[in-house]
Regions:
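Short, small-residue-biased leader/transition segments that mark boundaries at the very start
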Residues: 1-7
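Rossmann-like NAD(P)H-binding beta-loop-alpha module
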Residues: 9-37
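Peripheral (often C-terminal) accessory segments that flank ATP-dependent C-N-forming ligase machineries
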Residues: 23-25, 118, 122, 130, ...
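ATP-grasp fold ATP-binding core
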Residues: 26-44, 67-76
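Phosphate-binding site of ATP-dependent enzymes
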Residues: 50-134, 155, 160-162
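Conserved metal-phosphate-binding beta-hairpin within the catalytic cores
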Residues: 73, 83, 140-172, 182
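A short, polar/charged loop-to-alpha-helix boundary motif
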Residues: 105-106, 173-180
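Generic C-terminus detector
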Residues: 177, 183-201
Length: 201
């Protein structure tokens, strides 16, 4: 269906009580990398690690937020996110948002203190944007999602689409991505929520 290749960045999961050496992280993932809790939201406990000395403190920090920690390779590219919902008679994939963070990554400050620029629709070539929309819809179906979801990607050199994260309970504050995308689509969030609720009954 024109999805093209989809990439997933190199990652490791650690559970509490499991130890990993600095050398293992460097050999398997490389530096810089992200070390973050594998649960929760708002980028609490996330560290961008650039040096060997920072690996273990970052793991400890992440374990304060979750019993599982994820170590992910760093990717340089354009961060985007795309929301979607489906009912029995319609499919809605929202305009894509591009995230330009003033910080090292899209952390709590960038999310909630206005330290980022969010551009909807994203500045992507149309064929790349269409691939992202098709991919978002396909993932929704593959996972059997219901209600609203939001999927985060990074577009790297050569217009490679890299899947980052699937959010099945996306934020719904006024400044969150989904309400922004709903507005950009010329829709009203109340109508969207009514649509989803009525589809349940």
């Amino acid at each position: 269906r024109g999805l093209g290749d989809v990439y997933k960045r190199q990652s490791l999961i650690l559970r509490k009580g499991f130890e990993i050496t600095d050398e293992e992280v460097i050999n398997k993932i490389g530096l810089p990398c992200f070390i973050k809790p594998n649960a929760g939201g708002s980028s609490f406990g996330v560290t961008k690690v650039k040096t060997k000395e920072d690996i273990q403190p970052a793991i400890e920090k992440a374990f304060e937020e979750s019993d599982e920690v994820m170590i992910e390779a760093f990717m340089k590219g354009t961060e985007i996110t795309c929301g979607c919902y489906k009912t029995s008679d319609k499919e809605v994939v929202f305009p894509i948002t591009e995230v330009v963070s003033a910080n090292e990554f899209f952390d709590y400050g960038a999310k909630y203190n206005g330290e980022s620029q969010e551009i909807t629709p994203a500045r992507l070539p149309e064929d790349t944007a269409e691939r992202v929309r098709l991919l978002t819809s396909a993932i929704y179906d593959i996972l059997g999602c219901s209600g609203l979801i939001r999927i985060d990607y990074i577009i790297t050199e050569g217009e490679k689409v890299n899947l980052l994260e699937i959010n099945t309970t996306p934020g719904m504050t006024a400044t969150s991505f989904i309400p922004q995308q709903v507005r950009a689509a010329g829709l009203d969030i109340k109508d969207v929520m009514t649509d989803i609720i009525e589809n349940k009954f």
